[in-house]
Amino acid sequence: MVLVTGIGRCGTSILMRCLKEIGFYIGANCVWDEKIRAGYELPVASNINFSMCRDYFGKGNPINLDDHIHNHYGKLIDLTYRQAIGMVDEKGFIKVIKDPRFTWYPDIVEAWWSVRQDFKLIICHRDIESVVKSRNMMPKEHSDLKNRGALQYKEDFADFFTKVLQLEIPYETLFFPNFLRNFKSTYNVLEKVGLHFDYDLGKKVWDCLIDRELLKET
């Protein structure tokens, strides 16, 4: 399984959209929001991470994997964090999952790795000042718990990446927007994490999708 993550507004969504159009299964109920040109988070995974953020980090408490998880409405459900993480794609149908919350607190990716070590990371990154500028342009209803300044985002990413290195989690990186115009390099990264597909087919899908997205920015 591949987890795609990044601090936000750094190309994770467009990467997922491309993978979906190539033919990779990214899970049920993963939707694209044209208003912000982003999406494709797997609800079951994002709910686990969102619940961790709400239950622990707002209160300064360490993650207890044997606590019961809350749903998006704050209601306890009959699953512990350990069970819920282990059940994500337990049948192996989903090839790639996206959620930016893995970068928010290093304890989140550590919690997942302590339960299951069957995933690799694709870490999308971007100039932090550009991330903040892009986030500030988003509608208020799409703001998130980590609506912070450049220094805080730099610290978040440093803490996250240090934890990835410490735990020796396999990873590859893509830098936004550079990777949008370098399909060969992007293809090589996807191959390295086990996302195999025909190069020519992928390039055709990629070029068409990237051209459409760039056209919307003009």
What are these regions (language model features)?
Residues 1-82, 204-216:
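PAPS-dependent sulfotransferase catalytic core
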Residues 28, 173, 199-201:
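A generic structural-conservation signal
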Residues 88-197:
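PAPS-dependent sulfotransferase catalytic domain
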